Amino acid sequence: MKTLYSLRRFYPVETLFNGTLTLAGRDQETTGFAWWAGNARLINLSGKLLGAHVAHAGLIVFWAGAMNLFEVAHFVPEKPMYEQGLILLPHLATLGWGVGPGGEVIDTFPYFVSGVLHLISSAVLGFGGIYHALLGPETLEESFPFFGYVWKDRNKMTTILGIHLILLGIGAFLLVFKALYFGGVYDTWAPGGGDVRKITNVTLSPSIIFGCLLKSPFGGEGWIVSVDDLEDIIGGHVWIGVICILGGIWHILTKPFAWARRALVWSGEAYLSYSLAALSVFGFIACCFVWFNNTAYPSEFYGPTGPEASQAQAFTFLVRDQRLGANVGSAQGPTGLGKYLMRSPTGEVIFGGETMRFWDLRAPWLEPLRGPNGLDLSRLKKDIQPWQERRSAEYMTHAPLGSLNSVGGVATEINAVNYVSPRSWLSTSHFVLGFFLFVGHLWHAGRARAAAAGFEKGIDRDFEPVLSMTPLN
C-alpha cells in the first residue's frame, strides 16, 4: 500500500547535495527526494504529510493571531486605520466588529478576542502537527482507511475534493450568517457616511448574481469587481455556498467520468499544480477587488481607491473655489475643457481636469450629489454636506500610492501625507503571490505531465560540477 510504484522511476533527476544527511529516516534512498525537497519526501507517507499540513496550518493561524495582537497593541483610535499600516484590523472592522457610524472604532476588545482565539487555535494545530509528524502512524491507509488515500485512486481523490468544497461552502455561509443574524457587517453606503447594519434583503436573483460574471472586465463594466452593494455581495456568498456544498456532495457520491479520467493527470504533483493554478486565479482576482472595490473593502478602513483619491481632489478644489466665488458650472480650464465640470463620452456631467479618466468612480461621499445626468449642478451649489468635504479632503491626501521604501503619497503633492495605503499593500502582495503561484503551477504541471508520459527532461547530471565537490559535512 505504501509504495505502489517507485518514485525514483518518475524522478530520476534529483541529485543529493549531501548523501549522508537524513531527516527522521526519510532519506533520498527511500523516497527519491533529498532532505531539501521538503514535503516531497512525504508523498507516499500520508500520516507524515498530514502532520506537515496541520503544522503549516498552525503556523498560518499563529501568524494571524500574533499579528492581530500586534496591531491591537499599536492601534491609535484617533487616527484612521489606513494611516497606521494595519492589514488585519481593517478586515475585522469590515465584518462589523468594534466599529460604529462613519467607521469610527468604538471598541477594540473584539480585536483582542480575535487575536487570542487564533493563538489558542494555533497551539492546538501545532500540537496536532507535531504529533502526526513525529509520533503518529507513518501511513493512514492501514489504521484509518477513511483518511488514507492513494494518489492514483481517482474515486478517493474526488471524494477528498468534495469534502474540501463542502468546507468552502460552509465558510461562505459563515459570512452570510454574520451579515444576517450576528450583528451585521459594515456598510460604507449607509446614509450619512457608513455604519454597521444587518443585511435584510439579500439579492438572490440569478440574473443579477450571474450577470456580474458576464460583464466586460473593462471600463464602467468591471466584471464582478464592480459589485457595489452589500445585498449583492451577501447574495453572491449564498449562491457560492450552495454551489460549493452541492458540488461537494456530487463529487463525494460520483466517480470521475471517462473524459475526465483521460484528460487529467492523476498524481500528487498534478493535484499540486491544479491547486496552485486555482490559488493564482484567486490572487489576481483579489488584487483587482482590493484595488478598485470600495464596498467589499471600505475606504474608511483601507484608504481610498486610486480613482477615489483623484476624484476627491477635484471635489475638494471645486468646493474651495466655489466658496471663493468661482462659477464651477462654466469655468474653463487650460485645455479649453471645463475646469471643474465637463461631460463624459456618454453625456454625463463629470469632474473636469486630469481626473476625467476616473469619471466612472462610484463612492458613498459623492453619489448623493449625482442626478439623472451625472453630477447635479444645483446640488453641488446647495447640498454639499460637511462630512462629504471632510472625507474628500482626507482621501485626497491619502492616495494609494507608494514605493518600495515605504515613502507613500503623491511625490509632487504638497498636501500629501507620508504613508503607504494598505490597499497598495494588499493589491501588490496578491498580484505578486498570484504571479509566483502561476509560475509554480507551470513548473509542477510540466513535471507531472512528463512523469505521467514516462519521461522527464532534466539537466544531464553526469558532468555536474557539484559531483566533484567535497561533501558539505
Swiss-Prot record:
Post-translational modifications: Over time a tryptophan in the fifth lumenal loop is converted to 2-hydroxy-2,3-dihydrotryptophan, 2-oxo-2,3-dihydrotryptophan, and kynurenine by oxidizing species from the active site. This oxidation targets the protein for turnover.
Q: Which family does it belong to?
A: Belongs to the PsbB/PsbC family. PsbC subfamily.
Entry protein name:
Photosystem II CP43 reaction center protein
What note does UniProt attach to the cofactor annotation?
Binds multiple chlorophylls and provides some of the ligands for the Ca-4Mn-5O cluster of the oxygen-evolving complex. It may also provide a ligand for a Cl- that is required for oxygen evolution. PSII binds additional chlorophylls, carotenoids and specific lipids.
- Provide the primary localization: plastid
Q: What Gene Ontology terms for biological process does this UniProt record contain?
A: photosynthetic electron transport in photosystem II
Q: Which domain of life is it from?
A: Eukaryota
Question: Which molecular function terms from Gene Ontology are attached?
Answer: chlorophyll binding; electron transporter, transferring electrons within the cyclic electron transport pathway of photosynthesis activity; metal ion binding
Topology term for the membrane:
Multi-pass membrane protein
Q: Which GO terms describe its cellular component?
A: chloroplast thylakoid membrane; photosystem II
Name the HAMAP family for this protein.
PSII_PsbC_CP43
UniProt site (Susceptible to oxidation)? 365
Q: Which residues carry this modification: N-acetylthreonine?
A: 15
Which positions are annotated as binding [CaMn4O5] cluster? 367
The protein's organism comes out as Spinacia oleracea (Spinach)
Subunit description: PSII is composed of 1 copy each of membrane proteins PsbA, PsbB, PsbC, PsbD, PsbE, PsbF, PsbH, PsbI, PsbJ, PsbK, PsbL, PsbM, PsbT, PsbX, PsbY, PsbZ, Psb30/Ycf12, at least 3 peripheral proteins of the oxygen-evolving complex and a large number of cofactors. It forms dimeric complexes.
Q: Name one Pfam family in it.
A: PSII
